[in-house]
Regions:
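N-terminal, positively charged regions that mediate nucleic acid binding
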Residues: 19-65
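Active-site-surrounding "flap" and adjacent substrate/cofactor-binding loops of secreted or lumenal enzymes
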Residues: 85-103
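Short, charge-patterned binding micro-sites
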Residues: 66-88
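Intrinsic-disorder-associated, low-complexity terminal segments enriched in Asp/Asn/His/Tyr and depleted
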Residues: 8-11, 19-21
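Glycine-rich, mobile lid/loop segments that gate access to catalytic sites or pores
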Residues: 31-35, 70, 74-76, 104-287
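N-terminal low-complexity, intrinsically disordered segments
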Residues: 39-42, 94-98, 135-137
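Short glycine/threonine-rich loop-to-helix capping motif typified by GTGT followed
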Residues: 89-90, 281-295
Length: 295
């Protein structure tokens, strides 16, 4: 069973990495990305999830399919909520209030940051929610529809696997995820927690990361090839001579307080590249910089 498990994992990994032949002495690299809760797309996920949680708390049998879009402009930000929600009884859910609270909790309570969800003047919420289509619901309800015994509403394809390649690292044991995505997720989580705790006082909600891991010929993680971090920040030019000095400060802070506290030290060597805000400044962020969508 253990041998089959290893072969299965390596076959899956081989496909993801481009059919690398580990037995031929070749190494390979694999990259994974993660975004923080302040990223526009993830903000939409948070809002949709918050609405789902509210509906299920009132009706455990609720059927909820909610899509959210956010976008900011110079003068105003917008949250668009649409979808289909069906409950077993008439319940009242304040979708706008839920959306605003969710965005505020993420950190969007200042228009200069990307959105001020606390202000009805600076942030407009539009809600277009209907009940689930009867043509769809009859495919979900047992005893209804063309096949009365099915009770399935849709078709889909899913795949995935658990792996133990993180178990060699104390802080990542029993994660059961590939190392690149596990580290990427922990980088964005560390930045979010650092902002909320005050460790990174100049940080703003929108951030993302990407980790590239080099795998040896045996298919096991060997080293961190590249670590990329982007974090939205306060305009600090008043405190520095120029943008270059501002960037050096941000790079030093993130490398010291985030990267070296998240990435296991044995994965970092003299050839590991650490790139922080590689495009330069990242003051304008969130829904103002990019439209966000659920999913």
């Amino acid at each position: 069973m253990q041998t089959s498990k290893i072969i299965y994992q390596e076959n899956i990994k081989s496909k993801l990495m481009g059919n690398i032949n580990y037995g031929g002495g070749m190494s390979s690299i694999f990259s994974s990305e993660s975004v923080s809760e302040g990223h526009p797309d993830k903000l939409c996920d948070v809002i949709s999830d918050s609405i789902l949680d509210a509906c299920l708390s009132l009706d455990p049998n609720a059927r909820v399919a909610v899509e959210t879009m956010v976008k900011g402009t110079e003068k105003k930000s917008f949250i668009f909520i649409s979808g289909e929600i069906t409950t077993s009884s008439e319940i009242e859910v304040d979708y706008e209030k839920i959306a605003r609270i969710a965005a505020i909790n993420v950190g969007y309570n200042d228009h200069d940051v990307g959105m001020d969800a606390s202000s009805s003047e600076l942030c407009e919420v539009t809600v277009k929610i209907t009940k689930q289509s009867p043509d769809i619901s009859q495919g979900v309800d047992l005893g209804k529809g063309l096949h009365e015994g099915h009770g399935a509403g849709d078709q889909g394809l899913m795949f995935g696997f658990a792996c133990d390649e993180t178990d060699s690292y104390l802080s990542l044991q029993e994660v059961l995820m590939p190392l690149p995505i596990a580290l990427s997720q922990r980088l964005t989580l560390a930045m979010t927690e650092g902002i909320k705790s005050g460790l990174i006082q100049w940080g703003r909600p929108d951030s993302k990361s990407q980790v590239t891991i080099e795998y040896g010929s045996d298919g096991k993680p060997k080293r961190a090839d590249t670590i990329v971090v982007a974090i939205q920040h306060l305009d600090m030019l008043d405190s520095f001579e120029n943008e270059h000095e501002e960037h050096n400060f941000i790079e030093s802070e993130i490398t010291k307080k985030i990267v070296h506290n998240v990435i296991p030290h044995e994965l970092i060597d003299e050839n590991t590249r650490i790139l922080v805000n590689g495009t330069g400044r990242f003051v304008k962020g969130g829904p103002y910089a990019d439209a966000g969508l659920t999913g």
